[in-house]
């Protein structure tokens, strides 16, 4: 309403020149012919009934206060709309002279564009600030404000913006693709690293397990190759008698193959005839000789049943079954011939009646039985007629040195003496090396390995192939010593090959060496004798030197300088004395 009043007031106070200009501007859009018809002269007269809302020519010269309509009848002087009007207001604005153009009569039809420009400039001059702000807000609009204006479709800025957006979009796509590729690569490398770490862990565990198994096999191989199976056992005075009793024992058992009957392999008549009267050298305990095994397998003599008593009667007593199939030849597995006697002697060395077999071992080596040579009986007999045989340092060292051998005689003297002492007159010593039941234990290095009986299982293929002899082949590393075609050199070659393999493995990796004993803790024979001399009981003769020497021999160790004993063992033994 305020805009309407302002326009209405401008219309009321236009000068005649301004009115002509306004009419010319309004009639410039019409053709000249129509303009002449439409142009009317303004009525100078006043019509009291004209109102500002009616298009009358007389309304330009009359004031709204003198309007004849009844619309303003109730208005007084205080309520007049012209109270705020400034009479000193200048209607002429700077630059208004440039807006006057040619009259409509002098303009031709070709000047249509010029009039349009004048109209446009005139209208732009009359636009207020509000419309200018609206035009600024709509400047980005491509369509023109007037219907005759064509929209701008090809603007360089819009093209650049579109290109920038497309380039940014492509860059983002490439960046996202690159990031996805990197993530996939990292994930793949992570999986490969995890698998490699897992495989390395498994390989390390397997290598450790193989190293443990290799150490165990090296220990077993060292026992077999060095022949130290009985060295530690025979160092005890009582054990020497026991092991010599095993060598003097006439009991021998050859394990036959499961499912086979005794045949020509066990009983070789020709071999028995050639080896029957043959004398061999003194056997070394713990070592089996091929000729002795052949002689033992070929001998045939009469035997007594396991339940009979010792008898010198040359009559043959052989176990006979109900159908009479077994003969006296089958007893050759358990007995052997005494070549020193002129005739066959039936000696009953069975487990139930033999006194030699009772030396701390039963018939099968599993349960102890009462023995004639028990520790109590031996102790009584030794103390009843005891005489001291050591009278000085030299004899003491000689007695103590019997625990070890030398270059000329590698067998300890204690072992030889125990062998000669255990030969009884009822059973004269034989020159043949007849293996007892301990030769099976010697093959395994003198140790009972429970793994052989716990972990080993008979393969199922043996049930179909009737081959049940694989257990003994796996349990004992040595081949069949009882076969005539056996050659002992094969065992040596096999051991050498294994040793060479171990040497090659030692060259590749550092071998774990068990730390040895401290040499400073080992006392020689001279130091032990000096210590005994400092004891008052020894000077008074209250100490049994023979018994003390035998106890020291049990703890003695062989070294390059002679026999040595650990200081702790010496303190323990002397403290008990």
Curated annotation (Swiss-Prot):
Region (Basic motif): 159-180
InterPro entries linked to this entry: AP-1-like (IPR050936), bZIP (IPR004827), bZIP_sf (IPR046347), TF_PAP1 (IPR013910), Yap1_redox_dom_sf (IPR023167)
Gene Ontology molecular-function annotations: DNA-binding transcription factor activity, RNA polymerase II-specific; RNA polymerase II cis-regulatory region sequence-specific DNA binding
Biased composition (Low complexity): 347-364
Gene (UniProt): napA
Annotated bZIP domain residues: 154-217
Disruption phenotype: Decreases the level of cutinase cut4 during oxidative stress.
Region Disordered, residue ranges: 25-178, 294-386
Motif (Bipartite nuclear localization signal): 117-124, 144-151
Biased amino acid composition, Basic and acidic residues: 109-121, 133-144
Protein's name in the database: AP-1-like transcription factor napA
Domain note: NapA contains a C-terminal cysteine rich domain (c-CRD), but lacks the N-terminal CRD (n-CRD) found in the yeast homolog YAP1. It probably also contains embedded in the c-CRD a nuclear export signal, with which the nuclear export protein CRM1 may interact in the absence of inter- or intramolecular disulfide bonds (or otherwise oxidized/modified cysteines) within the c-CRD.
Polar residues compositional bias, start-end: 26-64, 299-319, 365-377
Described function: Transcription activator involved in oxidative stress response, specifically during hyphal growth. Regulates the transcription of genes encoding antioxidant enzymes and components of the cellular thiol-reducing pathways including the mycelium-specific catalase catB (but not the conidia-specific catalase catA), thioredoxin reductase trxB and thioredoxin thiO. Preferentially binds to promoters with the core binding site 5'-TTA[CG]TAA-3'. Activity of the transcription factor is controlled through oxidation of specific cysteine residues resulting in the alteration of its subcellular location.
Keywords attached to this entry: Cytoplasm, Nucleus
Annotated region described as Leucine-zipper, given as residue ranges: 182-189
Family membership: Belongs to the bZIP family. YAP subfamily.
Listed Gene3D superfamilies: 1.20.5.170, YAP1 redox domain. Chain B
Pfam families reported for this sequence: bZIP_1 (PF00170), PAP1 (PF08601)
Database matches in CDD domains: bZIP_YAP (cd14688)
Highest rank taxon of the organism: Eukaryota
SMART domains: BRLZ
Coiled-coil regions, chain positions: none
GO cellular component, one term: cytoplasm
